Structure formats: C-alpha cells, structure tokens
Amino acid sequence: MAFSASLFRTKTVHTEDALCPRSAIQAEQPPNIIDCIPVAGYEAALVTNALFLLVLFVFNPLTCKGNWIKAILFYSLLLYNMILAIFLVIDTQHFVSALLLAYVVTFLILWTADRVRLSCAVGSVLPFVDMRSSYIRVDNGNSSVVVPMNHTKHWFIRNFEQSCHCENCFYIHSSSYVECTFISRLKKSILVSVCDFSLGGNVSTVFVPSSDKTVPLHIIAPSKLYV
C-alpha cells in the first residue's frame, strides 16, 4: 500500500472537506478550492519509514550475509524516500518534497562521510556493503584481507570454529600474520600475538593491542567465534 503511486496523487477538494492542511492552497485557485495529497499518502509514508527504521535498529545479525541484508534494507529506505520526493515534486508539492529531500540528502551525506572514512581506514569498500563499524585487517606479506567484527573490543582470537562462512573469514583464520590491525570509528590499533592455547584439538592465538603499558587480558573460550 505504501508503494502505490495513487496514494500520493493530488486531489482537488473544497476546503471544508479537510482532506489536507490549508497550507497546501495554491495562490492561483479560488479560496474555497485546494489541491492536496490525501492524508492516507502521508500516513503510508510515515508507517513505511517507521517500519524500516525499526527493523534497522532491532535487526542485529551476527553473520556477513545478515549484515548485507541490513545494508540492502537501508539503501532501499533511502531509495523509497528519494522516489517519493521526486514524485511529490512532479505533483507540485514542493514544500513537502523539499523537506523530504533535505532529510534524505542530509542522512545520505552523514552516512557516506562515515563510510568513506572507514573505507579509507581499512583500505576496502566493505563498509559500504556491511553495516558494522569494527574491522580486522591482516597482512601476511603477499596479500591482505579485511573482515568485519561484531564486537567493539580491540582483541582478536583466531582458529575458532565460527558461523561466518565468508571466504575472508577462513583466510584470516589460516593466514600467517605479518601485521594485524583493529579499526573502528574511534580508534585504530595494531594487534600483536600474546599467547597460544589449545581448544578442541585446535591451537588458537590471542591478539591484543600493542602497548607499552599493561594490557588487561580476559579470555573466555567460546565454542564459536562470530565475526
């Protein structure tokens, strides 16, 4: 229903019909006649935005595929509002369309600036298709790879069984590291190997931030590591 163009087509009504606010009255028309979009159109747009935003805030996937779906939902919301704003411009609803365009453009600028900054930091376009904001970048001398992380703590444990089935995840857990870096919105830390331990027949390595100071280390050995 919210995607039906008929909901947003203007209708000419008498002012006493109260289908839309009086601010929509056009100067060239008689005082008792107005062109407006029915209230149902605005309600549909608000409900659609509310549902999309609710899903984006509540949906917190642990896997790469889930985060790609979340990114698609986000871009779909921006596209929906952009198309709606263009449709309102065509129907001469300039005030409402201007507000909607300002909302979309402002949101898009802030999002793009954040993603560009992260992309430059990690050296990959992955932040544009993955909604997470913490990444591990590893370099084995011949090549490097970036893997998004669910947690915001700058530590990393490799060689655990994990539910992420991306090729990058398997690469990062089998690679011999030359450099390992944790990158997020607020910090960029070089990680160093501090200890190895055996779990389920697999030898795992703990990485923590490189620091001259004492680094608190708390290891809880899970059966799975989500990345």
UniProtKB/Swiss-Prot annotation:
Residues 134-191 form the CoV 3a-like viroporin CD domain. The chain crosses the membrane at residues 39-59, 71-91, 93-113. It comes from Bat coronavirus 133/2005. It is found in: Host membrane. The keyword Oxidoreductase does not apply. It is a multi-pass membrane protein. This is Non-structural protein 3d. One of its GO terms (cellular component) is host cell membrane. Keywords: Host membrane, Membrane, Transmembrane, Transmembrane helix. Coiled coil: none annotated. Residues 27-130 form the CoV 3a-like viroporin TM domain.
